Amino acid sequence: MLAETLILASLSSYRAQLLKKAGLNFFVKGASFDEREVEKTGKTKNPKELSCFLASAKAKNVSERFPEALVIGCDQILDLEGQVFHKVKSIEEAHQRLCILSGKIHSLHSAVALFQNGQEIWVEAFSAHMSVRPLSSEFIERYLARVETDILNSVGVYQIEGEGIHLFEKIEGDFFTIIGLPLLPLLIKLRHFEVIDG
């Protein structure tokens, strides 16, 4: 067994909810750094590799503060034709984002990393491909009025488990990858390391 204590290095309530529903016992400790500044120190511009870099950076940051624990780091990158998009800060930005995504296919790269004692044990990214149907500006306004600021927590300004499903005509990929935590591969690793019952 690697560790008795499991820590999620993410303040995302959605990720914590997924782990709780899967029956995991864990603590939540957010990474203490400016994500955009750390991103600048990365050696890659590749969106999928960047998601791994950021997931690892978060896990390492928390792991160095809690060396005995096994730390889960996560990150999700929205990739539209190689361009990286981050979370928006306002409903106005959300409207602009949906106008950009309208009628196009983008990818969500969700990475998960495991660290202990500041050392990487595992990191991997998984991708989902999202085909957004053509959206009128009026529909986007009505959609945003209904979902309000909830969607500001989502890099794609949609929550696939709610009304966000109406934005798409096709989705290829795992549900958990879209939510931002590749749960099945993570559980396989946790069983392999005898952190959870297997």
UniProtKB/Swiss-Prot annotation:
Pfam families (UniProt xref): Maf
Active site: D75 (proton acceptor)
Tagged with keyword Nucleotide-binding: no
Keywords for this protein: Cytoplasm, Hydrolase, Nucleotide metabolism
GO cellular component: cytoplasm
A GO molecular-function annotation: nucleoside triphosphate diphosphatase activity
EC number assigned by the record: 3.6.1.-
CDD domains for the chain: Maf (cd00555)
Cofactor(s) demanded: a divalent metal cation
Subcellular location: Cytoplasm
Reactions performed catalytically: N(7)-methyl-GTP + H2O = N(7)-methyl-GMP + diphosphate + H(+)
Site (Important for substrate specificity): Y14, Q76, E161
Gene Ontology BP, a term: nucleotide metabolic process
Matching NCBIfam families: maf
HAMAP family: Maf
Similarity comment: family membership: Belongs to the Maf family. YceF subfamily.
Function according to Swiss-Prot or TrEMBL: Nucleoside triphosphate pyrophosphatase that hydrolyzes 7-methyl-GTP (m(7)GTP). May have a dual role in cell division arrest and in preventing the incorporation of modified nucleotides into cellular nucleic acids.
Protein name per UniProt: 7-methyl-GTP pyrophosphatase
